[in-house]
Design a protein with these regions (language model features):
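Von Willebrand factor
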Residues: 123-180, 185-227, 232-234, 256-265
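Acidic, Ser/Thr-rich peripheral helices and adjacent loops at domain boundaries
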Residues: 177-195, 273-282
Length: 293
């Protein structure tokens, strides 16, 4: 019985993470081929552990119409609508000590919740994700970062935006995968997810690749997400190039630290990131905000 349960959980994890129809658990030819592919790849199985959950978070956000345009600030309100409550509020239900506090806030309509919005489209730009694949990220950090990247790809595609994934490690290790809406397959996505470069860390190569995409590949309205676990300084020349490009294209750089709780790791991102999040502190609510730049 335990083996059958574990097998069913594995199927649900893989289909929920990678399928174009994550709620369809039927033994279709597409699902069977997907299961076989992912089962043969340790990297894809590891990513599945996080990706399915991330897809659920954003599906719920979309269902509840938390649609915010590029550069628009999200807003909260107080109430007792549990479908729009922040996950940090619902977390009070997890322990007996905080349940009375939650119930009191619920009765008084003091639950923090998203202000409901009508679905809107405000011409959001493309997304460029720079993903650190140096040797130090191998394991859970690499799987978590790749799951974030794959979620950003899905969101970009749904919004008819282009997406670029810049895999980076040392100064000579860099690979770029470009995904245009309607022009890539599931196999393309799986292939990109399996890539792992290994080696050292260099921030300048991915920064310059991102600038090149904006200037030469039609990503001039893109924003950048920069995911890393490492510390690396940019030269004055590279910082000047980035500042000039930001002035010309009006984009932001959002940094995500795979920090494992290390308190002082953000200093190397501060010179070029307008927003910095820590993986160790990210809530479901913060994950929603990262994708609505």
């Amino acid at each position: 019985v335990q083996a059958a349960t574990e097998r069913a959980q594995e199927v649900q994890s893989i289909i929920g993470a990678w399928s174009d129809e994550p709620m369809n658990m039927c033994r279709t030819p597409e699902n069977l081929a997907l299961l076989e592919k992912v089962r043969q790849s340790t990297a894809l199985k590891d990513i599945s552990k996080y990706l399915g959950r991330f897809r659920e978070i954003f599906a719920q956000a979309k269902k509840n119409s938390y649609a915010y345009g590029r550069g628009e600030t999200y807003s909260l309100e107080l109430g007792n609508n549990l479908s729009r409550a922040l996950t940090s509020e619902l977390a009070m239900l997890a322990t007996p000590e905080t349940i009375p506090l939650f119930l009191r806030k619920y009765q008084q309509k003091q639950i923090k919740q998203y202000r409901r919005r009508e679905p809107i489209y405000k011409g959001m730009g493309d997304i460029i994700c720079c993903l650190d694949e140096s040797g130090s990220t191998e394991g859970d950090a690499a799987a978590w970062g790749k799951a974030v990247a794959m979620t950003l790809l899905e969101i970009a595609t749904e919004d008819h935006r282009s997406f670029a994934l810049i895999h980076f490690a040392g100064s000579s290790s860099c690979q770029v995968d470009i995904f245009r809406p309607g022009e890539y397959t599931l196999e393309d996505k799986l292939s990109a997810a399996e890539i792992f470069l290994g080696g050292g860390t260099n921030f300048e190569r991915p920064i310059r690749e991102a600038i090149h995409l904006m200037e030469s590949e039609g990503f001039e309205k893109a924003d950048v997400v920069f995911i890393t676990d490492s510390e690396c300084a940019l030269s004055d020349g590279c910082q000047q190039e980035l500042q000039a490009s930001q002035a010309a294209h009006h984009f932001t750089v959002t940094g995500i630290l795979l920090d494992e709780g290390q308190a002082d790791m953000d200093f190397s991102l501060k010179p070029f990131c307008q927003n910095i999040y820590r993986a160790s502190e990210l809530t479901s609510d913060a994950l929603v905000l990262i994708t609505h730049m």
